[in-house]
């Protein structure tokens, strides 16, 4: 007897594995540092706005997320008509793949790029092409060398998760200039709010002046609205029109839109989170090497910690050691980084405890 057969590429997809969610136990404090969630939570104004929608849950959302698009446009100086909102930037990434990829096409991403990219690519029957990195950083020359006549889309996480590295805006522009004009360049800026580098730019200028580049962003990180699944895209009119044709008409709920509008207006909340992150990025980059560990310098709200391969000091053993003590980090085997753990920058207490416990694990006084 025959049975349904999935489309080409579906069974080649390795299911996405999110960061571990610890199970709370009575009398035991647990810190989840595995999913790059903000320790500050959402803005109080966002919480109040979310609750304000409770009396009208019978109403469908306005179909284009107009109030949220206008708020994003005002915050970034963008034309709201060139913005699309989605249920997390994940939905938008998948919509882009569905719009521009088909069997026989190719999409390029970097060696340690976000795992949603190959999932979205393969789900549409296209080939996932991996470009090697240099020092855990996107290599523009390698990406350009990977281009073939079948290339239709390039994924660029800038900055990148899980490495925490970035490329300067001049390199982004060089990448765009070197790509054929029919290739869509997707600038995934999920962690852009944490970057404090003069040579980094979001990419608005590039999107504004081309017809083949888009920018995606999220409310899950610095705004603390991961549970509500809200993301957005800024793009040229031709791409916005194409993606809107397959976007679900009510894809962002009213409570989520109201919370996001309030969140983007609370700049003080964002700045407090940025300052806290920057302080601990520097502290961890200074203290962890003293324990015999290597840290990839990050511009995000997490750090990538590399462990020795010596028995008793490995990343897997460190992961088990920390988890037992209520400190849950992210193992990265599925990213091709089996000897590293990714640590979200958490509260002062959580970060200090990680340092204290890693000092014990590494046998340092």
From Swiss-Prot:
Cofactor(s) the protein requires to work: pyridoxal 5'-phosphate
Chain ranges passing through the membrane: none
EC number of the protein: 2.6.1.9
Region Disordered, residue ranges: 1-21
Amino-acid biosynthesis is among the record's keywords: yes
Pathway(s) the chain acts in: Amino-acid biosynthesis; L-histidine biosynthesis; L-histidine from 5-phospho-alpha-D-ribose 1-diphosphate: step 7/9
Pfam families assigned: Aminotran_1_2 (PF00155)
InterPro entries with a match to the protein in the record: Aminotransferase_I/II_large (IPR004839), HisP_aminotrans (IPR005861), HistidinolP_aminotransfase (IPR050106), PyrdxlP-dep_Trfase (IPR015424), PyrdxlP-dep_Trfase_major (IPR015421), PyrdxlP-dep_Trfase_small (IPR015422)
Highest rank taxon of the organism: Bacteria
One GO MF term attached to the UniProt entry: histidinol-phosphate transaminase activity
Any single biological process term in GO: L-histidine biosynthetic process
Complex formation: Homodimer.
Family the UniProt entry places it in: Belongs to the class-II pyridoxal-phosphate-dependent aminotransferase family. Histidinol-phosphate aminotransferase subfamily.
NCBIfam families: hisC
Listed name of the protein: Histidinol-phosphate aminotransferase
Biological source species: Rhodopseudomonas palustris (strain TIE-1)
Lineage of the organism: Bacteria, Pseudomonadati, Pseudomonadota, Alphaproteobacteria, Hyphomicrobiales
